[in-house]
Amino acid sequence: MTERVAILGCGYVGLELGRQMRADHDVVGVRRSDDGIAAIEDAGFEAVRADVTDPESLSAVPDADWLVFAASSGGRGAEAAREVYVEGLRTAIDHFWSRADPPERLVYTSSTGVYGDHDGAWVDEETPLDPQTGKTEVLAEAERVARERPAEHGGHGSAARFAGLYGPDRYRLDRYLEGPVTAGYLNMVHRADAAGAVRFLLAEGHREEVLLVVDDEPVEKWAFADWLAEQCEVSFPPKQTTEERLADDGLSETAKRRIQTSKRCSNDRLRELGYEFEYPTFRDGYRDAVREYRQN
């Protein structure tokens, strides 16, 4: 039997997931905007217009064996995030599991931001959460919904905690080449591996409640910026300590908490399950971006 996967909020990672799965699975991408629908169609799989906060519109989405909830709040504040990540997720779960042919499982795409600050120490799936902004508190709440709500209907839910996403259109070279670069750790995962890890969870039938999705090598921001400058054959960028950055009077409280957050995320569990990274470290993942920069 060919499984059908419905990707709710089929954006940056969802489009890549659909491209990876379309050869062996029936894939449906769900967005609410014209541009979103066009992007799904361009990626080569079925597009359906619906809104996760509107159960009536979700009726247009066909039955699916697997659900991936990757909707975005569009960079807005905590209340907008709650509407999508918590209420929208709850609405989608209740809608699909009320059908005569409900899904088997759900994967919700979360963020390593739920850990908060660990002063550069390692964190893994067993580390207690300590969200320090309104939005990351919402993400932690959404994880609980993703794990618990499907179980109430006899299904299974998982949360895939993505580290900082990068890849096509998101290399952000100027940020690190021009600086100033603030101290702290970077935890990253290439878009291909963020999508690949979700595909792996679904296709291999792994039923982890929570899984960290991050590459092999957390790196200090200063070291990464210097490596990138060296590869691009430009001068090393200016740097700031955390204290120097926090002295900026224009920072919001949310920005200050983000700057003070430092941790190293472990992918040991994902590796133990057998996932093979396409881009194990930033050195692999930034190769094409560096080549393009040097050619220009």
What label would you give each PLM region?
Residues G14-L15:
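N-terminal Rossmann-fold NAD(P) dinucleotide-binding loop
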Residues A50, P55, K256-N296:
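C-terminal amphipathic/interface module of NAD(P)-dependent oxidoreductases
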Residues A64-L67, S73-V107:
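NAD(P)-cofactor binding segment of oxidoreductase domains
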Residues T91-T133:
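Conserved Rossmann-fold NAD(P)-dependent oxidoreductase catalytic core, especially the SDR/UDP-sugar
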Residues D119-A159:
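Catalytic helix-loop patch of NAD(P)-dependent Rossmann-fold dehydrogenases
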Residues E137-A140, G167-L177, F200-L211, E217, ...:
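Glycine/proline-rich active-site loop of Rossmann-fold NAD(P)-dependent oxidoreductases
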Residues A159-R161, P180-L202:
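Substrate-positioning beta->alpha
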Residues A197, E204-R258, S266:
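Mid/C-terminal beta-alpha module of Rossmann-like enzyme folds, strongest
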